[in-house]
Amino acid sequence: MRKYVLFFISGNNDSQIWATTPNTPRVIARGGLERNIHTRTLARMVNEDAPGTSTPAAQSRLQTTASPFHRTHLTQMCRRGDTNASLLRDFTRMIRDTPRNFSKNTQHGNDRDFGDLERDPDVDLLLSKVCLECVYVEPKEGAIPKANKIFISNFLSDMYINLVSVTGEVMKIIPIWKNAETTRKNLLEKGKHEPCVVDCVDAAFVMKSGITVVLGSDFTTAMFGGNERIAPIFIKEMSNQRVGRKFRLFSFAENRIFAVNEMRCIVVEIPETVTCKSATELMRTCFLHLDRDLSRKLLIKWRSVKRDVDTERLDLDRKEMIDVAIFMLDNVGVRVTNVVAQERADSPEGHGGKQMRPRMSDSEVLSMMRQFFEEMTFRPKSEVITEDGYKCHLSVELDPNGEGFVHTQDLLHAFHSQCEDWSINTMMHSILLELIPYAYLLAKVMNYRAFEEYYVQLFKHLLSQIAIEFKIPPEIHEKFVGAIHIPKPCWSLNNVIAHIICERTTPETMESIPKFISKSSVRLLTILAVGRKFIGMGTNIDMDCERWLGKDWKRRIGLSGDILKSFRRIMNGKSSNSAGRASQLIELFEIGSITIDFMVLAVKVLMLKFQTDAFAGAQSIEPKKCIYATADEMISIAHLRWKNDIRMHNVQLMLNSSRPILIATNILRKNEDDNMKELQDRFLTQTSYRTFSQPFGRAFLDFRTAVPSLLTSIYIPRLNVGGMIYPSRVTCDPPTTEIFKLCTEWGNFYNSLASALRIGSSETVRIDNEWIVMVSKNIKSTAVIGGMTLGFGLNGHLAPFNMYHAHQMLSTFDKFHSVALLIGLSASNFTTCDVQIHKILATYLSFLMGPTPLEIKLDFTIQTAAISGLGLLFADSGNMTIAKKLVNEIGRAPNRDEEPVTDRNAYKLSAGFSLGLIMLGKGNGSASTVIPFKQNIPPMSQRLIYMMNGMRRDKCVFLPQVAPPVVNDVPNLPFSNGGMMTSSQVANHVKESEYINIHQSAEPAAIALGMMFMKMNNEFIANALALPGTITELERLKPDSMYSRVLAQCLVMWDSIEPTHDFVKSLIPPVIREYATAALHFGVPIRRDEDGEEVHEAINDAEEKYWAEIVDKGTVSQTFLYAVSAACMAIALKFSSCGGPNEKNIVNTAFRIIEYYTKIVMPDGKSNKDMGSIRMCIYSGAYTRTSCLSMLITAMAILRVGTGDLEVMRYARLLRLCDKPESDWIATGKKHFEQMVAHQALGILMLGEGRYAFKKDDLSIALTIISTFPTIPQSVSDNSHYHQPLRFLWSMAVEPRLLVPFDIAESCVVEVDVTIVMKPKDGNEPIVYKEKAPYLLPPLEDLQSISIGGGNYQLVHISLQSEDQVKVMKDIMTIGQGRVMLKRYGVDSSEMKIKEATTLYDDTPSLMSMFNNEDTAVELDEYEIQCMMEKIDEGINLNSSDEYPNVQIELSCVRDVTERTTMDLAQLQKRSLKLLSESLDLWQDEVNVSNTINGLADAVQDMQI
């Protein structure tokens, strides 16, 4: 016991005053009980002599009186501790802080447990009675005088209320533990446990030691354990009667108390029960197994004889643990004596003179030196071997009185339980060897053969070095054996673990574990059972635990309160698998990495595997804050994905429109007479086709790669259409013609649109209306504002747009503003059917607006944008009212109000797109459930077929009547004139007959029909869409419409799409295939000459003339190419961005098929083509060949989206550079389309800088078809046949899929393995394959799980089996930018660990030296050892634990651990290796290592010890 004395001087002797001055605490409004206690206490116990209470009336109310005296902080603390107000502190905290339904045997931070006292419904009244009757009210019979202090103490889990009365010099100790009813009896009915009254001046409770220090009335200090006296404490400063009366005791820290008077403060340190960890664990285990009353007596007895120990002693841990073991044995009647070695031999006499001590012998000097060097090198100390060869001698006797014999069995189970706990903790193996002899001799004395044989089997070498002498008379031994219980089976923690990890064990065959296993081991077994899916897989967790652990499973695991709630939450969590639950239990049970590191290898490997495999589905990975990748990060990602080239940089240069156009004058001017200015203007006009089309591709490349600054405007790169003359480097202004200015306006529109698409979507970036208005305010060009607005709308940022600003922009009737808002607002409200947006669109559509007195002339481009927005707003809604009106718009004839009708084709095509979006995959919709009118109206599908093939207009167009119905005509008809117009409504410029104009209605009708029946496999619709089977019928069709019909047929018969030549040919009419072979010689094998060169047949004029009279070769060629391009587009749409080994093979096959047909339409001289391909290109015409080539290259790009495929990139560059700009680009009329498709293909390959891919749902497929529809515009401003702003609808059909592993510590992108598990299809097994990340994932809906990491990084597992998990993964891809945060393992290789360990020695120990040592010697020759270790190395090198780096390190250390195992632990190590081998059998990939380690265990077993 230590004490520290502090002195302080006061100017006044005011101890009596400040000791009784009340200091009212803050009243916490918890309830009536607490307020009642505080109020009544302060009202009754206030001191009449204290300041502030001069009048009696003041005694009945709460008062706070400040002390007039100045004290130090220590004095104030002591003062507060002795005031009347703080007398209630401990007790009121118990009332306030104790939760309801408090479970029994629960230890909290303050080591106070109220059991089920709080469960009693009358607990408040009971506690109130305790307070008021025992503390606060007037004395009565059996009560003590007025109490000055109250505190709670506990001793061996029993709780007591201590009431100290300074005036009466007594302390009353009331037991309150057991349960509520017992407590009530003790307090009210004078039950068995009577309160104890002790003479006491003051007392304080020491929390850590669990004792109460009492200052008696005779001024002696004593220790109490609960209500029993343990031993006295001598404190010199308090032994004087005159001085001791003035001391007051206060708790301080965990094992210290304050003794304070007016002049000094003494800090007394109470010694701990035991000092070392091993002794503490052994004593706790013994007390848990022994009877409660016996444990109480033993603890009091131990504390009474406990003395200070020498903490500097090196073998303190070992000695104190042995003392505890001998003490426990002695108190159950088994007396064990450690026979001390004989006295040291006399040393020879010295060389005369006086000697202070005898001279040491040579053997003693050698022993002392060896001990010194072993301590310096941190080696374990060698045991002292006596002359007879034994390490120690133990003498065993039995108490002849037989006291404690009945508790012997409990003590044996306590020793055995502690030995088993230490056997799985390698750090405690040395202490385990000290306890084993005492457990063995106890089992031998008790004649428990099973336990005796168990210890001999495991520790035969150790027990052979210990001499045990039994000095037990037979009659006493018979009395002893008769007193003990029948022996119970010997159990082993190793066997329990082996049973759990055995492959053949199932939840049904799992055996219940012995009840003697400690709480820490039960927790470990629970983690292993949860990891093995034995617990937690059913719906009733309590039943599983009760079946395995018994009815008291909560107590055995140590669950109560918040820990029990957390345990249930973990086990009932649906987002985690077994490994995830096991990892969470490791954290809940506070099993740290250091504890795991000292477990035996088998358990350690399983725990590390659980931690590595742990995940909570998508719950284990939460999307981080959206921080878009910086330029350096994107460069690093591109470098990791494409290590050997700079393809990303090349694509960026090809899509850069801000550089001036280089004009080489030496090439342009071919003779001196040419006008250089005219040549420059013409050259700039032609090259502007490329510049104006670059934003179409740059929108793909930069898609959602930036976050705007809210303080600055959006960055829009300059659209540079000027030139720079070479070599003079003089700038050249662009042409000033009206056509060029119009193209420049539309070019700026698409340029700003592409810049706006750089901003992230509304899911990741929030942009408000004010910022959009601020950005637009400083821009003068309406085209730039319109393109920017449309880009914001496509990204979803116009959903919260202020309608006031929208109407303000629309009221200008500017076409750029109108087009942008009508499409942008609809895109931001995609599929929502918003009423407000519907009203805006209806304003621009006469068939929705109806007759109006306003005569407003609207641009047809604006009306086209409105009808396109209508499809986006009502997409996938099946609105039959709007759908029927759109059908009429496709088929009706132009009227006088719509002249001139320059954009009529685009309007009808957009109406077809909108109709397809609204009725997507719904067929005829709800038409079958509608009551028919008296007039027979065909189904919607039939009307579209009429419009596609041709029919009278009154059979498919049913316009609502405008004028009042004619009398005596067909009454009450909703339609009049059969869709025909009156003479006043017929247009002047265009006269259409009574039949449908299929040249304008065929394409929209076909594409709408295909979308309506998408993936429905309706053979009737598919046959209607199929190309006719005769040349005559084919010649009636517009060639462009063939592409729409074939593609629509593929959409309907989606399941029949296959990447084969047979599928492509099945879509071509047989007559076309026959004529292509006969008339064009297409597909005829090329003959080769003797040298192997191709021999192309010359065109025979007679044959050509013959076939020209028989068939139109142009029809054959165009039909063939359009059918092929549509079939290839369908293949690309279905198999785009698919993953998995099988899918990759399918994608590669599909690519080769598309490439095969692409080479047919390649420009002349760019590929080796046969004569049939050349003839087909000649007869099909330039436009057909351009359209088909563009679609085939687009199909290849869609198939390889986001991959940066070099082959597709070469085809796109070929299309981009097939004609030189100095040729006549203007006259061809198709260069803008070619350049646009080339740039689109380049952008698709690098979509979002490689982060995005196309989605696979029906809406996304439809939007992709609309944005890539092969209608050839003449220029960037040409919207007559196709509304070009629809080219950007693909932005709503893509999703991020790039998985980016991100090193948290280094804040950089790293390359790791990613294992992908595909969902099983058609009843097959799941497909597993491995790739390198960063990696573009397949569609998330097709994945079952993803595992990313391994090697030096943690392995993160993401499950995608439920919709919630897929949603979280999509959030990771969008909000988190695809980043998966990985932690790098700070582990070294096994060689590094061994190297660091051997640096402690002067000489690196060799294998043979370790085995030749007396502690590790085995009788194996060097060759056998070498073969065994080489086999281990070979097996470890063959394992596949790269995904578990910590496990890999532990397996690599098996050899090192085995070499350094002492002979005393050889069998224990052999058992551990066997367990490790069984644990590795759980991994299919670790068979080699398991067999190798199993062989090592057999070799260790065969060692002759």
Swiss-Prot record:
Stored InterPro entries: Apc1, ARM-like
GO cellular component, one term: anaphase-promoting complex
Disulfide bond positions: none
Outcome of gene disruption: RNAi-mediated knockdown results in defective metaphase to anaphase transition (Mat phenotype) and embryos that arrest at the one-cell stage.
Highest taxon of the lineage: Eukaryota
Gene3D superfamilies listed in its UniProt record: Leucine-rich Repeat Variant (1.25.10.10)
Outcome recorded upon mutating residue 975 to L: In ar104; results in sterility
A single BP term in Gene Ontology: protein K11-linked ubiquitination
Keywords (A to Z) from UniProt: Cell cycle, Cell division, Developmental protein, Meiosis, Mitosis, Neurotransmitter transport, Transport, Ubl conjugation pathway
Pathways involved: Protein modification; protein ubiquitination
Keyword Cell division assigned: yes
Consequence when changing residue 411 to F: In ax143 and or224; results in sterility
Entry's Gene Ontology molecular function annotations: molecular adaptor activity
Effect of residue 1197 to V: In or170; maternal-effect lethal
Function: Probable component of the anaphase promoting complex/cyclosome (APC/C), a cell cycle-regulated E3 ubiquitin ligase that controls progression through mitosis and the G1 phase of the cell cycle. The APC/C complex acts by mediating ubiquitination and subsequent degradation of target proteins. Developmental role in early embryogenesis and the metaphase to anaphase transition in oocyte and spermatocyte meiosis and mitosis in germ cells. Required for embryonic anterior-posterior axis formation.
UniProt subunit comment: The APC/C complex is probably composed of at least 12 subunits: apc-2, apc-10, apc-11, cdc-26, emb-1, emb-27, emb-30, mat-1, mat-2, mat-3, such-1 and gfi-3.
Family assignment from sequence similarity: Belongs to the APC1 family.
Protein name from the UniProt record: Anaphase-promoting complex subunit 1
